[in-house]
């Protein structure tokens, strides 16, 4: 149900500010045209642009903390989350599992309780038109992970990509 009063309050509030973080460029390289009508240039351009934008966002996520993916664990048996190749998930990625902790002032902070890694062959290909091109992993609906360290994970705990050297 739409609450028009809340929408109006949000739209009229002038206390929001934006801070420029950075920029990223991307070049569309090896694009598979499978699943496209070759005679429809707008469909080809849409796929090229969408994939390039997704790639740029992934690069921003790797470079700036503000852009890092934070998403809940969807399940724990098996460990899954609703992220995939569109968000830059590869077998080399590592994610910290975060548990919310509420202090005496009611503020929420997050404590690391473990680290997980994507399982090869079980990474969801959720990129634009991956299903149409029959890409590996496009038949999945989430990415499966394995525990690297820690334990006692619960659905809903946040995961966040960490840098691994």
Label for each model-derived stretch:
Residues 1-165:
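Surface-exposed, polar/charged interaction patches used for macromolecular assembly or partner binding
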């Amino acid at each position: 149900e739409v609450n028009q009063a809340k929408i109006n309050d949000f739209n009229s509030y002038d206390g929001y500010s934006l801070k420029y973080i950075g920029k990223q460029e991307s070049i569309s390289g090896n694009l598979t045209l499978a699943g496209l009508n070759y005679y429809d240039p707008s469909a080809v351009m849409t796929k090229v642009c969408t994939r390039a934008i997704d790639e740029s966002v992934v690069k921003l996520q790797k470079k700036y903390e503000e852009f890092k993916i934070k998403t809940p664990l969807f399940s724990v048996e098996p460990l899954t989350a609703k992220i995939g190749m569109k968000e830059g998930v590869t077998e080399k990625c590592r994610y910290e599992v975060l548990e919310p902790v509420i202090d005496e002032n009611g503020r929420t902070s997050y404590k690391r309780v473990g680290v997980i890694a994507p399982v090869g062959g079980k990474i969801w290909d959720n990129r634009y038109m991956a299903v149409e091109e029959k890409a590996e992993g496009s038949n999945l609906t989430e990415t499966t992970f394995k525990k690297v360290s820690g334990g006692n994970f619960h659905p809903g705990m946040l995961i966040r990509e960490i840098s691994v050297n």
